[in-house]
Amino acid sequence: MPASCLLASLLPSTPLRLLAAQADAPDCSASTNQAGVLHGLTTDLAALNRQRLSTAACEFETAELARGYTVALGKLADFPGGQHHLPGPKAMRSGSGRLRLDGALLMALATWVTAAAAAVPLVETASGRVAGTQTQDVAVFRGLPYAAPPVGALRWRAPQPVTPWANNRGASKPGDACPQKRGLSLEGGGDPGTLNEDCLNLNVFTPRAEPGARLPVMVWLHGGALIFGSGGLPLYDGAPLASQGVVVVTLNYRLGPLGFFVHPAIEREAPGDGVNFGLLDQIAALQWVRRNIDAFGGDPGNVTLFGQSAGAQSVLALMTSPLSRDLMQRAVVQSAYGIPARPRGMARDTGVRVATAVGLPGADASAAQLRAVPAEQLAALEGNDLSLALGFIVGDPVVPVLPVEAFRAGRQARIPLLIGSNSDETSVALAFGIQPARLIKKLGIGGVLLRPLYRDVKEDAELGRQVVRDVVFTAFARRIAVLHAVKAPVWRYYYDRVPDGLCGKHLGVPHGGEVAPVFGTADLCACTGVIPTDGDRAAARAMTARWVEFARSGQPNIAGLPVWPADTKRKNVLLEFGDTQVVRSAFMRRRLDTFIAAGNLLGP
């Protein structure tokens, strides 16, 4: 079969506006059926070719092609020969300055354009057109800027709008991660790749990159104690999750001393402005989603904000911030921790110490001097004697009060909430210097009073491990659930399914161990250190399905799985994810009631 006739069978899908022109053409009928078979067609295409057809010429602006194959679709049946290969004269420049192509060249170009368009999904955002990549089920757009680079005079400023671009912007590669201490990143989540202060970018994963699809949107905030991490890690690849019918957005936000910082010189420049710059970045990303996500097939009126660890803390902060309460319709909080945030005055003292640590005159350092310090030098301070960002800074427009206090006052977004924690959260708490003896002292109770709450625990080390887990994570989730249940429905979980290959090697599921099952990425990253079994994958699919249904409908119940009841102060009920999913009533009731009653332990 002539190649030109094969090309003809592909033409009806080409995204070009075609104009008709007449010319003689040979018959392709002898080969058309072969083209139909090759392309899986069952229609008798030979019937369409029983007469000689006229030449189809194409007239279009060359600039339209250069901008990425987005010229309006033409209806090829509207003009003679539109469905067929029709050779004719060579390409020439018309008197109008437009390019005229003969049929054969047109067909070759159309076929190339069609194939390229399938491989390069294009979306028009408010800032310009972006070109992503296409997998079998999902279109992926990586490294999309949602704010201007926070460099130079924009360091320690609220995020500013992106400068629009004129041509297609490639979105096939991850954007750079925000500056951080790489050693912490490698230990706590994976290699973030290239570090750059110009890091305010996000990634979109969508099964339908087209306006009007109105799919649920899930926006992910990564963990990392607000000092390390990246939305572009393989662990957070949104493609498996998006293949379930949701649009997934992952993002970077400023970290450590670049993201959460107070210094007298910076405050003098903009009195009263926010100092939780990382949270302001997250808010800017949510605003970007509201403006742009419809073009990617998402519903801007159905956004679920979900996050883990520091990302979960961020979700709680944004649920209570006056600047962001209306930017989400549902929330998922995975392993948030009850660690006090920093009052603004304490954060200011830390900022002065940072200035001294980089060789500047402490409180007398100027804003220009501070902004001249290399980002990597600031990031390197983390993990020394400076605790720069384990908690937010309380007392600015973003976080006017501690989130738990806002929940107590009923000033949070009144939206459905899914919240929980894992069975071995202490794996991370100990790494950040949270000692059991210190916690017990703060509680004002000794081991004699704790033992009745943990009758099956014999060793002191394990007792301390479980106390830390329950005080910092399990009780905190219950406390937030009780406070929120007064305003909106809450579903609570406890995750205790250790991967099959690690059974017997771990005391439970470590901090962050639920993330790969939620995203369905255990096969894409080395996050567990073992190859997932079919049992691991089945359990992960069931968990993913719950999260997706929650994003879709605002409740996590699915036919064929146990009914997950909403939690209330009276019921104290949750769903335990283990080898099976089991509803637990009065879960750890005595322990959690004791710790919550301790009052200030979970607050400032």
Regions found by a protein language model. Give the residues of each.
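Alpha/beta-hydrolase fold nucleophile elbow
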Residues: G297-Q308
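Hydrophobic helix segments
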Residues: P12, C28, A35, L41-L45, ...
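Glycine-rich nucleophile elbow surrounding the catalytic serine of serine-hydrolase chemistry
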Residues: Q308-A317
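C-terminal subdomain of alpha/beta-hydrolase-fold enzymes, centered on the catalytic histidine
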Residues: L316, V394-P604
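Substrate-access "cap/lid" subdomains that shape
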Residues: G188, A284-Q287, R291, A317, ...
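Bacterial N-terminal signal peptides
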Residues: G103-T114
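Alpha/beta-hydrolase active-site loop
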Residues: G272-D294
